[in-house]
């Protein structure tokens, strides 16, 4: 029975990863819709269910959107992106208050909560759509990203070099509605339990002073 149980868990886990591969509506995000003074950060670090949940818990972050960026196709869908049928990556766009949390602090969290040395994969997810990338909105952001990568490589934190792509921001397509707040709305999903929750715990371990009050008691 133990062997059968393990097989069933594996099947359920794999189904949970692919179950969302259905067509839906995506929206092109207009950056001018945010309040004056807001900062914008755009990162790709594997499955956006994980990265969205991480940054939603960071003090000073006002909104996090899951979506697609870094590719050339218009109106990409989850079905297309998740199966590698576009040049886009799963990504998140963060709206933050720079008076509370700096772009550098967001960068530090980004690099600490995923493996930036893995090329075209993160954990169980494989393919260029799960690549690590940081999309800069200004020259200051570009310099901060490059300096952070250089610092990480020099530190010897990882055996391999950082492969995070540093690219100018172009467009961000917001993912289908059912992907937004996926972590919060699907706590029993095997992928959330096995992959996303450990990443959120890593955030809390390394950045305890940056957690929003409402998430401090979260297990």
Predicted features and spans:
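Bacterial N-terminal signal peptides
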Residues: 2-18
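Flexible coil/turn and secondary-structure edge motifs
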Residues: 15, 19-219
């Amino acid at each position: 029975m133990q062997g059968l149980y393990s097989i069933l868990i594996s099947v359920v886990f794999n189904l949970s990863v692919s179950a969302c591969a259905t067509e839906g509506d995506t929206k092109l995000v207009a950056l001018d819709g945010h309040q004056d003074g807001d900062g914008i950060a755009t990162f790709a670090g594997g499955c956006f269910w994980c990265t969205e949940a991480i940054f939603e818990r960071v003090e000073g972050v006002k909104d996090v959107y899951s979506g697609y960026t870094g590719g050339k196709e218009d109106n990409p869908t989850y079905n297309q992106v998740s199966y590698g049928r576009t040049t886009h990556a799963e990504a998140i766009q963060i709206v933050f208050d720079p008076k509370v949390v700096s772009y550098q602090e967001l960068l530090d969290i980004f690099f600490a909560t995923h493996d930036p040395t893995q090329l075209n994969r993160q954990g169980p997810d494989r393919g260029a759509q799960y690549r690590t990338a940081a999309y800069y909105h200004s020259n200051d952001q570009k310099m901060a990203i490059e300096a952070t990568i250089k610092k990480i490589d020099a530190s010897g934190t990882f055996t391999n070099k950082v492969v995070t792509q540093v690219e100018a921001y172009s467009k961000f397509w917001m993912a289908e509605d059912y992907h937004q707040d996926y972590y919060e709305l699907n706590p029993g999903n095997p992928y959330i339990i096995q992959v996303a929750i450990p990443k959120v715990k890593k955030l809390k371990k390394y950045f305890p002073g940056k957690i929003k009050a409402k998430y401090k008691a979260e297990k």
